[in-house]
Amino acid sequence: MVTIRLARHGAKKRPFYQIVVADSRNSVTGRFIEKVGFFNPTAQGQEEGLRLDLDRVNHWVGQGASLSDRVAKLVKDAQKAA
């Protein structure tokens, strides 16, 4: 099953997440199909906190991909902002 989920990157105590489309059987930070955005929960000032390609997310959801709980909230926020 294909899932759109967060893959953690960054340093210790400085999380940075890539939003990726991946097979649910692969590890969280392992192999993925496509990057569709990023999420920076510690963004300050002019730093961009969320970038999401909504066209690609909608494409993958149309193909049957499921969203993780956190990604579903981020997509909802991105649609509200757009």
Swiss-Prot record:
Q: Which UniProt keywords apply?
A: Ribonucleoprotein, Ribosomal protein
Annotated signal sequence range? none
Q: List the GO molecular function terms.
A: structural constituent of ribosome
| Record PROSITE patterns | RIBOSOMAL_S16
The answer to whether keyword Nucleotide-binding applies is no
- Family assignment from sequence similarity: Belongs to the bacterial ribosomal protein bS16 family.
Q: Which PANTHER family does UniProt cross-reference here? A: 30S RIBOSOMAL PROTEIN S16, SMALL RIBOSOMAL SUBUNIT PROTEIN BS16M
Query: Mind telling me what this protein is named?
Result: Small ribosomal subunit protein bS16
User: What's the source species for this entry?
Assistant: Vibrio atlanticus (strain LGP32)
- Give the gene symbol: rpsP
